[in-house]
Amino acid sequence: MVFDFLQPVSSSVEEYISTLSNQTLGKKVVLHTQTDFPVLENIALALITVNENRGAGKENKADDFEGFRKEFYRLYPGNWAVSMADLGTIEAGERIEDTYFVLKKLVEELVKKRIIPIVIGGSQDLTYAMY
């Protein structure tokens, strides 16, 4: 299954979220953790980070998704009631085409479930993999 390629959210992000106010986004989002994968029934938005930059002609260095998540989850939601899951990170494949394949299949699976994917990270070429 394509979800097997996702790396869970780090335990330090989980610990950070536990210190936040109950009104923050971090307390409203269902996380892919070391022990659990979110049930996607009733989920409207899915956050996915992609650790792939080779398409930009750069060395593939790891992005700071942990820092991004900590800043994002401390925010307060607006006047909306949308369910959201953080599915974790797609790590770079052995070849860039491997990453494209996983991202394409993951987006395809989410759209079939009527879940809007929010893809963070990677280079511009990943846009093509999503279509």
Residue map of PLM features:
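Metal-dependent C-N hydrolase catalytic cores
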Residues: 2-131
